[in-house]
Amino acid sequence: SEASPEVNQYTSKFDAYLAGQATLTPEEEDGLEVFRGKGLCAACHVLDPQENGEPALFTDYTFDNLGVPKNPENPVYDIDPGFVDLGLGGFLATRPDEYGQFVAENIGKQKVPTLRNVDLRPGNGFTKAYMHNGYFKTLEGVVNFYNTRDVKPACPDPLTTEADALAQGCWPAPEVAQNVNTDGLRNLCLTPMEEAALVAFMKTLSDGYFEP
């Protein structure tokens, strides 16, 4: 589970900062403030300690549809070009007798993940993938999507990669159009410096900063 020591050891720079054993850089501090406030990040990636007293896991365990585009690099499209990941709603639909009444409102919703170790990598040059389908390959792209999803125009090609979308100043259409969250994502009006600060802060969540 997300709370297990194999997944989260709570040995990040942020944990050391909370314990008074490390100091965040000015950029990291700015990112924490954006995370708590203007960026609306903490609404879902909560900063509160767990009920058992352990540090925050940066998730509220809810489900959301963020309007993430299809990942054109997903090999499933070689087999089924029409494949759509319906998320929680798709699962509930497999048990209509038990959960049928909840299907429609949960189509496209995916579980809010922990942000701990969001930038932890096994080695230099390792490319991470973010969101439920791996569409994003950079935290910078993720943050820019949160900030500008409802501002930038739609890309002409719904299978545009993150890199091409950033270069073109557009975002592809959502993989699932139903139930897209318009509260936590909109025009957040973050500046480029605030976006960069958010990324810098999230990089403080990687375990291994100190020995447990």
Identify the role of each PLM range.
Residues 1-212:
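Periplasmic c-type cytochrome electron-transfer domains
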